[in-house]
């Protein structure tokens, strides 16, 4: 079974509580998603490799550490995943950004893929798939399927809120993909929404339905 990490930092949990509220404005929702993604990034990026580098301070020459230049890619699942990109890019600005577009069929609750735009060397990159919600797991599974078909193998999934059903589905389909989430909620309701959740993240991010 794949690994899941729930990031319980007090700042993340505080901001997530505001994010969930019905009366949080579109502007505030957008800003909070960006901030939470950035804060989660410290844990998500914890295992990036380092290398020695010789530098000169105002006092002396010294050997210090820097990122080893591993190629990274942030891949949002459209459309809601877009809201998490800038927060992570603020930490790793050299990362490439791909896009996987999906929408959910409201009758079957199954994802339908309509766009895949990825860096040409995606198979050589460490990939962070981002989507605010991990509900049924269908979109996450399809996104990882698309990446693996193109040779990708080092993939992590980053979300703000997850449901046990979605976590289980993604772990069973792709046990090699580590999941990072700010909250593991109670369950899905009959419409496939996370309870207590935060509603439709895409609608709330962009102010459209």
Curated annotation (Swiss-Prot):
Activity regulation details: Allosterically activated by GTP.
Keyword Nuclease: no
UniProt entry keywords in alphabetical sequence: Allosteric enzyme, Glycosyltransferase, GTP-binding, Magnesium, Nucleotide-binding, Transferase
Biological process according to GO: UMP salvage; uracil salvage
Annotated residues for binding of 5-phospho-alpha-D-ribose 1-diphosphate: 79, 104, 131-139, 200
GO molecular function: GTP binding; magnesium ion binding; uracil phosphoribosyltransferase activity
InterPro entries: PRibTrfase_dom, PRTase-like, Upp_B, UPRTase/APRTase, Ura_phspho_trans
Keyword RNA-binding: no
Record EC number: 2.4.2.9
GO cellular component, one term: cytoplasm
Cofactor or coenzyme needed: Mg(2+)
Catalysed reactions, semicolon-separated: UMP + diphosphate = 5-phospho-alpha-D-ribose 1-diphosphate + uracil
Family: Belongs to the UPRTase family.
Record's function text: Catalyzes the conversion of uracil and 5-phospho-alpha-D-ribose 1-diphosphate (PRPP) to UMP and diphosphate.
Descriptive protein name: Uracil phosphoribosyltransferase
